[in-house]
Amino acid sequence: MRVSVPGPAAAAAPAAGREPSTPGGGSGGGGAVAAASGAAVPGSVQLALSVLHALLYAALFAFAYLQLWRLLLYRERRLSYQSLCLFLCLLWAALRTTLFSAAFSLSGSLPLLRPPAHLHFFPHWLLYCFPSCLQFSTLCLLNLYLAEVICKVRCATELDRHKILLHLGFIMASLLFLVVNLTCAMLVHGDVPENQLKWTVFVRALINDSLFILCAISLVCYICKITKMSSANVYLESKGMSLCQTVVVGSVVILLYSSRACYNLVVVTISQDTLESPFNYGWDNLSDKAHVEDISGEEYIVFGMVLFLWEHVPAWSVVLFFRAQRLNQNLAPAGMINSHSYSSRAYFFDNPRRYDSDDDLPRLGSSREGSLPNSQSLGWYGTMTGCGSSSYTVTPHLNGPMTDTAPLLFTCSNLDLNNHHSLYVTPQN
């Protein structure tokens, strides 16, 4: 089993024997081998699998595009972790959809296994290599978002001071991943010896997959810290999320990305001498020769399963986690507003509760729950409460008879508005 060793950034594709052919991919030894092999997958099966994955990527593109429009509709912040992650997933799904749609122009062959020989460097890198950079950037944004949640919950100034360093660290990691990916792709696309090709692939996999593993470890640390905070769930619910969703999505992303990175490192390390591996472990074929794949039916099914796990599941998890939601403005049930808070109505001069003290708050809370009927007197000093629609009772002074100098303030809400002069009772001679 002889396969070429490609880049570090993608899912596994099984292969069972390669034969070099002419750059045009026409008649040659490879075509004869493919025709002679009875175990090869028919072109219709390859086309069906390509169409299936293209539809899945197109559905992800449409869903992410819809979420971005919903963010604008709900008047959310245009530049946030949520919008950036959705945009990166949108761009990633667009590139993957374009790649799998090329199967129609390649007579049903899977473009991942049989890239066109005449494809120039930049389109080749953009379709085959750049999506891995987008996935790594999405993982970095997920780390930054959870770090932001920890800072918001703890409200610690020392964490805010390190926020800039944290942002710079993940930005530098993303740039390093991009530079290594682009540089190695440029070296491999040229005419390089076989030994240099092996070491280029090894260095690329070692750096990029190590960055994936380090980001996964940091994501584990952030999730562990969030689960230990009792108030983290309240903050996440105010953003339309929950602690359970955060743990599940983070665990799925960590498990899949770290397992793929470890697999890539193992395959590159083992195949340094023989270039043999049970799977074609990357998206792009870094050899400058065109190849024809002779793939059995079982290996092709395994390829589809691995592609679904390492590509679709983490991408859909991130998009569903950062989907746009209409936030509930009433945060009292979630505990964001305590019982001493007032209504959201804005008062300028006539706030009816501007003189309330702390002793009045339990009485106000019980009155909101309906514990006091309209006919019951509150017993405040100098107040008159209504026992019906037209009768009022004056509450006597607590320390004796009412003096002539203390006016009585009516607080009953069902007074006739035409009797303005009856609001204050003055001594009558």
Swiss-Prot record:
The UniProt regions of compositional bias labelled Low complexity, in chain numbering, are 1-17
User: Which one GO biological process term can you cite for this protein?
Assistant: positive regulation of TORC1 signaling
> How does the UniProt record describe the way this protein sits in the membrane?
Multi-pass membrane protein
Q: Where in the cell is it found?
A: Lysosome membrane
Lumenal face of the membrane: 1-48, 105-120, 189-205, 268-300
Q: Name one GO cellular component term.
A: lysosomal membrane
Q: Which residues lie on this side of the membrane: Cytoplasmic?
A: 70-83, 142-167, 227-246, 322-429
Q: Does the entry feature the keyword Transmembrane, yes or no?
A: yes
User: Would you list which residues are glycosylated?
Assistant: 285
> What's in the keyword line of the UniProt record?
Glycoprotein, Lysosome, Membrane, Transmembrane, Transmembrane helix
InterPro entries referenced in this protein's UniProt entry, alphabetically? GPR137 (IPR029723)
Q: Where is this region: Disordered?
A: 1-29
Q: Where are the transmembrane segments?
A: 49-69, 84-104, 121-141, 168-188, 206-226, 247-267, 301-321
Can the keyword Nucleotide-binding be found in this entry's annotation?
no
Q: Which family does it belong to?
A: Belongs to the GPR137 family.
Q: What does this protein do?
A: Lysosomal integral membrane protein that may regulate MTORC1 complex translocation to lysosomes.
| Name assigned to this protein | Integral membrane protein GPR137C
